[in-house]
């Protein structure tokens, strides 16, 4: 099986090297981002970033789920990002 694949690649490389090179570059473009450390950190940042930002409301004391101030820390901390 490996011999047939090697023979096929050798034959295609001899006939159409531009196509083989473009498919190789496209394959690397699909595979390499998953191995990049930037992908890891961007996923961590996206998980820690809230989708819904607090809206300033007048607190009458009966809203336990609304923060008292819009800048009160909520959710996961991003301290790990500051220490990089």
Swiss-Prot record:
Gene Ontology CC: mitochondrial inner membrane; mitochondrion; respiratory chain complex I
Subunit-level organization: Complex I is composed of 45 different subunits.
Residue ranges, annotated region (Disordered): 56-84
Subcellular location: Mitochondrion inner membrane
Protein name as it appears in the record: NADH dehydrogenase [ubiquinone] 1 alpha subcomplex subunit 3
CDD domains assigned: NDUFA3 (cd22902)
InterPro entries assigned: NDUFA3 (IPR026626)
Family assignment from sequence similarity: Belongs to the complex I NDUFA3 subunit family.
Transmembrane segments: 18-38
Function, as annotated: Accessory subunit of the mitochondrial membrane respiratory chain NADH dehydrogenase (Complex I), that is believed not to be involved in catalysis. Complex I functions in the transfer of electrons from NADH to the respiratory chain. The immediate electron acceptor for the enzyme is believed to be ubiquinone.
Top-level taxon of origin: Eukaryota
Membrane topology classification: Single-pass membrane protein
N-acetylalanine modifications at: 2
Keywords of the record: Acetylation, Electron transport, Membrane, Mitochondrion, Mitochondrion inner membrane, Respiratory chain, Transmembrane, Transmembrane helix, Transport
A Pfam family the protein falls into: NADHdh_A3
Gene that encodes the chain: NDUFA3
Taxonomy of the source species: Eukaryota, Metazoa, Chordata, Craniata, Vertebrata
């Amino acid at each position: 099986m490996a011999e047939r694949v090697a023979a096929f690649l050798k034959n295609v490389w001899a006939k159409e090297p531009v196509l083989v090179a473009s498919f190789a570059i496209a394959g690397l473009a699909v595979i390499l981002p998953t191995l990049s450390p930037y992908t890891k950190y961007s996923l961590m940042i996206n998980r820690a970033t809230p989708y819904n930002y607090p809206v300033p409301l007048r607190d009458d004391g009966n809203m336990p789920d609304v923060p008292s101030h819009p800048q009160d820390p909520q959710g996961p901390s991003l301290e790990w990002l500051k220490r990089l």
